[in-house]
Amino acid sequence: METLLLNDSKKIDDIKLIFESNEININLKNLIHIEDISSKTTGIIILRELKPSYLKPFVDYSIKKNIKVLAVGRALISLINTLKGTNEKVYRSFSGDRSTFISLGSRLAEIIGGAGPLKTNYLNSYEIPIENMPNNFLPSSINLNNGCIEAIELEGKGNIMGIIWPIFSSNKMPSRFEN
């Protein structure tokens, strides 16, 4: 099994260290061309904004072959534009707060082990209004203050998820759920 980091050779060593420090065995490789995807590929990580025309073949191939895709941070903007077939500005300046809501029954809730309201450990500089949600996607998490998207996932078949949180930074996302 291998996981591919899409066109981000500058960060690959940092990402490998994060996995290693958490005792997660990962075969992480840099991906530049669609031809670089092998039959052993199980996931693709996207960490930065990319042009929708560049990203689209990777997303389409991933859906066809059921390869997991995770778009992190500003890569979520690229993912949304790719899925909507546009290059428009889908974000605005951040007006929310550190409160978020993880949707019950979402894949995100399965991954982190719970759903409901929680506090994140950061304030972002941008937000994505809910009206920019691509077709066939569900909000996995929304900001409780402003209702903006913090995470999305493909409904039904497929394993595509995008999250606004900087999970590969030292500033981690939710530490606990609120009661």
Where in this protein do the model-derived segments appear?
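Conserved catalytic-site region of short-chain dehydrogenase/reductase
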Residues: 77-79
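Acidic/charged, solvent-exposed loop-and-adjacent secondary-structure segments enriched in E/D, K/R, S/T
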Residues: 88-89
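N-terminal beta1-alpha1 cap of cysteine-dependent amidohydrolase-like domains
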Residues: 1-74, 84, 93-105, 109-115, ...
